[in-house]
């Protein structure tokens, strides 16, 4: 796959609160404070900085300045540093992160490229499945489709998908749906409508998943948006192409 071309989206969302409860990130994420530094904490260890790159899979809480922060989820990338929790981005990486969160698709592409040195190339057939799953969360890509696309028996196909993307097939589908719903809510969509559009069983199902993966409940996130006028930061970029969603 050529440099800069990836099937993975980079989802940008506002964080309109001053604290996130304990939760693990599903994928690698860049947090950028709007006014002052951010602190992430886990098991007595903390990392503070204006822009932080947070390791996925580690349960952590977050303290933010009074204006909150923004986050870009770098889907498909492996955390490239040895730090157990997070690293503060400085210099050009910090500038790229700020530009990316501001809506600069070229900056998002370059940021991904500079952080991709620990990520293996994605097999072309897995990329096809990833594109299909991210394009429309209402389209239930099945294990049978995965098996046919990869031309492997089921167990091997599921292992191949996890090894290639870093997530199980089921978790990748759930995470893709959650990002879609979060983007809708960031543009002031009703929770029940966002849940339906993203394929969740009901509002309660979306609320449980949202809380466990983001560290706050949807109602708190939406209430926080009412106190800020930065909701237009919510975007979903497919790097290497035009933005798929610009929700401004």
Region spans (language model):
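N-terminal regulatory/effector-sensing and dimerization cores
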Residues: 1-85
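Helix-turn-helix/homeodomain-like alpha-helical modules used for DNA recognition
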Residues: 14-22, 205-224, 235, 239-248
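Short, Lys/Arg-enriched N-terminal segment that forms or immediately precedes the first helix
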Residues: 14-16, 110-118, 158-165
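Alpha-helix C-terminal capping segments
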Residues: 30-34, 38-41, 60-62, 95-102, ...
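Amphipathic alpha-helical segments enriched in hydrophobic/aromatic residues interleaved with Lys/Arg
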Residues: 78-136
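A short, Lys/Arg-enriched amphipathic alpha-helix from helix-turn-helix/homeodomain DNA-binding modules
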Residues: 113-141, 147-150, 171-190
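Basic/polar phosphate-binding segments, predominantly the helix-turn-helix DNA-binding elements
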Residues: 144-173, 195-220
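Terminal helix-turn-helix DNA-binding modules in bacterial transcription factors
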Residues: 163-201, 224-248
